[in-house]
Amino acid sequence: MTKVSFYKLAGDQTLALTLVCQLVQKSLATNQQVLCLVPDNRAAQQLDEMLWAFNGASFVPHAQGVDHVPVAISFDEKPGEHHQVLINLQAQIPTWFSRFERVIEIIYKQPDYEQAKRDNFRFYKERGYQLDFHDLSERFKP
């Protein structure tokens, strides 16, 4: 069964994308492929640029779209061939989330978005998914 982790931040979407970069790097270190599901093209471009500059000592192999690359960035409704780690920055849960070994939901400061993530937490909990919650609002600040 899919393991679901929630990470709560005190900042905005840009801070969330910084956390995504760290989580991507951590996943790659354990040879896991990642699909980063972002809300729109602007966020996809921003994450793409951040991954290029995130760590000067190592390359993060990534691309926009759902091609079979170690790290894919998409705002599309299709997961492609990915099935290991899904990092979801969209407000809603994709219908195909359960094909992934792990889903990471990131919560950042935006009222409607925060409420959607609360609803997502309830959805997973009611269906018996293993949930982890990490409140990084004091440790991971803008």
Identify the role of each PLM range:
Residues 20-66:
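Short, well-structured hydrophobic secondary-structure segments
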Residues 1-5, 27-29, 43, 81, ...:
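ASCE RecA-like P-loop NTPase motor cores
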Residues 5-8, 33-39, 86-88, 105:
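Short hydrophobic beta-strand segments
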Residues 65-102:
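Mid-chain, well-packed structural core segment of small domains
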Residues 121-142:
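Charged phosphate-binding loop/patch that engages nucleotide di/tri-phosphates or the phosphate backbone
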Residues 1-16:
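Glycine-rich phosphate-binding "P-loop"
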Residues 17-22, 118:
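Short amphipathic alpha-helical segment that frequently serves as the phosphate-/nucleotide-binding helix
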Residues 107-113, 117:
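Trafficking entry modules
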